[in-house]
């Protein structure tokens, strides 16, 4: 599939997604497979979780539009999935959802080394992140934080 047809297919699928308050966050076309595999990752525009029903409700109109477009002149498999949960916490929703969960916090040190703190996510404000490390709350200014990730708690 050439770039022009891939762009047309992507625009077509985005239109179908937008009509259902969804957005495409990933599109992978595996033309080396027989049949061709089209993997589409979707999420809801309002941030709600994607259900299996949402994937199924997107599948039929997406498939219909692909057929009508004649962009593919071969058989294909359409796979619709949700974005899933990322290990890295970035959105306000992530911080609310995973409050109390174990996290690794990567800190930027003045000597350009990275320090990792491990604890339970306690609180996030606009200025700092608070984690519970063995019963003590540590407030970390956001300008020191490089990355916050879910993890398994270490002793």
UniProtKB/Swiss-Prot annotation:
Task: List the subcellular locations.
Answer: Cytoplasm
Instruction: Tell me the first and last residues of the signal peptide.
Output: none
Give GO BP annotations, semicolon-separated: ribosomal small subunit assembly; translation
Entry-linked SUPFAM superfamilies: YhbC-like, C-terminal domain, YhbC-like, N-terminal domain
Q: Which UniProt keywords apply?
A: Cytoplasm, Ribosome biogenesis
Matching NCBIfam families, A to Z? Answer: PRK14646.1
Instruction: Describe its function.
Output: Required for maturation of 30S ribosomal subunits.
Q: Write out the similarity annotation.
A: Belongs to the RimP family.
What name goes with this protein? Ribosome maturation factor RimP
Name the species this protein comes from.
Prochlorococcus marinus (strain AS9601)
Question: What taxonomic classification does the UniProt entry list for its organism?
Answer: Bacteria, Bacillati, Cyanobacteriota, Cyanophyceae, Synechococcales
